[in-house]
């Protein structure tokens, strides 16, 4: 039996707990199963065969950038205010893709010299995680000789390493077909696609300590750091990206100073070339073993403070079978089941393409409704309903 067909996500999680010292070995198995499924074009979930068709342009549509880019934005939007989210970059991207608010791209905080970073050896930073969850390798392995081992044809014009200042890659329509590491990288019943922008941060740059104790890049490295950030934005503009999912760029294993990096992003995002270039910019920051703390503050807290966020947001996940409570239950419920509903399906509006939640009341007459997904993500208007303690209009019982 193929490794991908016999994958047991729960068993993988338990094995990780028992054999943490062999974590790299366990991650190597994940990538091996990902490659196996991708190269064969399918995987099995029980008795169901899930077809895995890579986008036709995932390799041919990939662009490697080696020089400074000066694109012209296709559209102009209102001044963008970056959001800081405590969550997984793919989970955040999936929410934005489902919301259909514009073309989405995720920043791959990449290795400058090796596509996929240390994914083959089982390393655990963000780029390796992206490779384990998708067919991203088909895009970037064309720029290295060993891509042939994975049936990826060699690009004859471009190669790694990426340019130190202006290097980057745009990868369209990468197919995501595995879940998050915490869940054991389960194979998904429904695949989805998103675009990636790969740019490498400075690797363990020289820093100085200011009198207030804050760390920052030495002066001679600041122009290079700014070039890298502008390259991210320029690649996005050049490819018509409207919604950007960024991260704490280089503030993990590469040991860039978080406060300074956040300040540089804020400064550059306010420049005339970029302040109206995007519909939405979200920093999705996941606190993990690669993250650092700054004066006992998490990366989420650091970026939130720099960007003036009132509070870091956590991505909410809703699933079929979740029982949710409408906020009016706090004031109007007369029985134990009033204003309780069960999510029975997710759907797409046939005319508008809008994502919908199908849910059924758990009280007579057990009506079924279809409402926009965004409605389930929206918060209660506390000015209109000051007495309500519930944060969201609909909250899963597990969140209460």
For each of these PLM feature ranges, what is it?
Residues 110-114, 327-330, 360-365:
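Short, flexible beta-strand-to-coil junctions
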Residues 366-400:
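Intrinsically disordered, low-complexity, charged/polar segments
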Residues 106, 196, 323, 356-358:
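Conserved hydrophobic/aromatic beta-strand scaffold that supports enzyme active sites
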Residues 315-334:
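Short coil-to-beta transition motif at edge beta-strands of beta-rich domains
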Residues 1-244, 248-313, 343:
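Macrodomain-like recognition of ADP-ribose-binding/processing modules
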Residues 335-348:
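Short beta-strand-centered aromatic/proline hotspots
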Residues 101, 337, 365-367:
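Short acidic/polar mixed-charge low-complexity motifs
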Residues 346-373:
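Basic/aromatic-rich interaction segments and small domains that mediate binding to polyanionic partners
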């Amino acid at each position: 039996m193929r490794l991908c067909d016999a994958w047991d996500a729960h068993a993988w999680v338990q094995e990780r707990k028992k054999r943490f010292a062999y974590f790299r070995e366990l991650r190597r198995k994940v990538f091996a199963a990902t490659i196996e499924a991708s190269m064969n074009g399918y995987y099995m979930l029980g008795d169901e065969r899930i077809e895995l068709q890579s986008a036709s342009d995932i390799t041919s549509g990939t662009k490697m950038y080696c020089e400074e880019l000066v694109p012209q934005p296709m559209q102009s939007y209102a001044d963008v205010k970056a959001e800081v989210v405590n969550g997984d970059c793919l989970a955040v991207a999936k929410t934005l893709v489902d919301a259909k608010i514009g073309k989405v791209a995720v920043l791959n905080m990449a290795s400058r010299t090796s596509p996929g970073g240390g994914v083959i050896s089982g390393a655990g930073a963000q780029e390796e995680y992206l490779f384990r969850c998708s067919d991203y390798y088909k895009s970037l392995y064309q720029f290295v000789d060993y891509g042939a081992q994975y049936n990826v044809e060699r690009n004859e014009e471009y190669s790694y390493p990426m340019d130190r200042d202006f290097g980057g890659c745009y990868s369209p329509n990468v197919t995501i077909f595995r879940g998050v590491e915490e869940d054991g990288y389960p194979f998904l019943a429904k695949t989805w696609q998103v675009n990636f922008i790969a740019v490498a941060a400075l690797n363990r740059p020289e820093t100085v300590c200011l009198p207030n104790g804050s760390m920052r890049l030495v002066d001679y490295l600041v122009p290079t750091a700014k070039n890298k950030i502008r390259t991210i934005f320029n690649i996005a503009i050049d490819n018509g990206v409207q919604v950007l999912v960024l991260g704490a760029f280089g503030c993990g294993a590469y040991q860039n100073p978080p406060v300074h990096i956040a300040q540089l992003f804020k400064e550059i995002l306010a420049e005339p070339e970029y302040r109206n270039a995007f519909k939405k910019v979200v920093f999705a920051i996941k606190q993990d073993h690669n993250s650092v703390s700054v004066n006992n503050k998490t990366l989420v807290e650091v970026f939130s403070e720099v960007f003036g966020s009132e509070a870091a947001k956590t991505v909410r996940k809703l699933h079929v079978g979740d029982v949710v409570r409408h906020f009016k239950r706090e004031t109007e419920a007369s029985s134990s089941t009033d204003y309780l509903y069960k999510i029975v399906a997710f759907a797409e509006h046939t005319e508008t393409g809008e994502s919908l939640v199908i849910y059924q009341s758990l009280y007579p007459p057990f009506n079924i409704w279809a409402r926009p997904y965004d409605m389930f993500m929206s918060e209660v208007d506390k000015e209109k309903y000051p007495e309500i303690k519930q944060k969201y209009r609909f909250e899963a019982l597990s969140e209460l």
